[in-house]
Amino acid sequence: KSALKIDPNQQRVEFSDGSLKYDHLVLSTGSKPRELPPYNSRKIKNLFTMRDLNDANSIEAFMKSGMRLLIVGGGYIGLEAAATARKFGVDVTLVEIEERILKRVAAKETSDYIRSLHISNGVKIKEAIGLDKLEIVGEKVVNASLTDGSDINVDFVIVGIGITPNTDLAEGANLKINNGILINEKCQTSVSNIYAAGDCTSFKYKNTLVRLESVGNAIDQATTVAQNIMKQNTSYTPKPWFWSDQYDLKLQIAGLNTGYDEVVVRKGESRQVSHWYYKGQSLLAVDALNDPRCYMIGKRLIEANKSPSKNQLRDENFNLKVLLK
């Protein structure tokens, strides 16, 4: 059943069929995918968003070899969907309104690598071009008009334009909200016996307010919440890490690149490469592409607040492991 309202003063959650008292309350309300206004994917049979296993199963059951797919959004969700669709023999066009794919989350070097990978696998990528409108016949999309004036005949559309944290319950309880439910280092909201964890939360990381959309963050915050409810007085220390699998590429990311002013490229063997984000002389994050060794070293350096010199990174013969001692 669904919770309808939280009463922090009475420490009570209301449901359609009654209510429940609490001593401690945990909000792990997650997030929902952004829709394409004015289109509602629940009413259009071949318009999909991607958020959970049910979405993935619905898309997989629908697509067949030779179908024409339009993906709206060049973030990780859209790109992973493109890679999967190509494995099924689907004809894929991806549009991204920004000047390059992954602009919000990655450096140009990472965007360039992944763009080339997709093009080599037959994906048509259109950057700085957005969706103008969809032509709906009955309950299906049949055509898409793009902002460059072109039209694409489509068999189905996947929308990957980000997510919105589910904060309605928290807002109704007058908890503090800022791009998510605000929490402190104990994962407490603005009401001390109400906690929150996962995609729905925002918090301070290196003096910047962030919201992390990752499995690791959700697990770590949930652990912190449980420990504090059990009076273990635990503080949550964010250790951001992410990954993305596309074709034979494994991209692993450690840290957050917010505010970077330089990217150092370290080449490895064959198709291995890593991109290291710096602000001044401080290491912020690393994107490791098919390079798990650099990912693990970078992750440990960031967590230890250590920064190799940029020349050390550029030197392919320099053993980064010595920096971990």
Which residues fall in each region the model found?
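A conserved short coil-to-beta-strand element within the FAD-binding core of flavoproteins
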Residues: 1-11, 127-140
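Short hydrophobic core segments
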Residues: 20-32, 72, 152-162, 222, ...
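Cysteine/selenocysteine-centered motifs that mediate thiol-based redox chemistry or coordinate metal-sulfur cofactors
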Residues: 59, 307-325
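Glycine-rich dinucleotide-binding loop and its adjacent helix/turn
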Residues: 29-88
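FAD-site-proximal beta/loop scaffold in flavoenzymes
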Residues: 43-65, 138-145, 150-224
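A short, polar/charged loop-to-alpha-helix boundary motif
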Residues: 292-311
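Mid-to-C-terminal Rossmann-like scaffold of FAD/NAD(P)H-dependent oxidoreductases
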Residues: 200-296
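Rossmann-like dinucleotide-binding cores of NAD(P)H-dependent redox enzymes
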Residues: 76-133, 214-215, 238-243
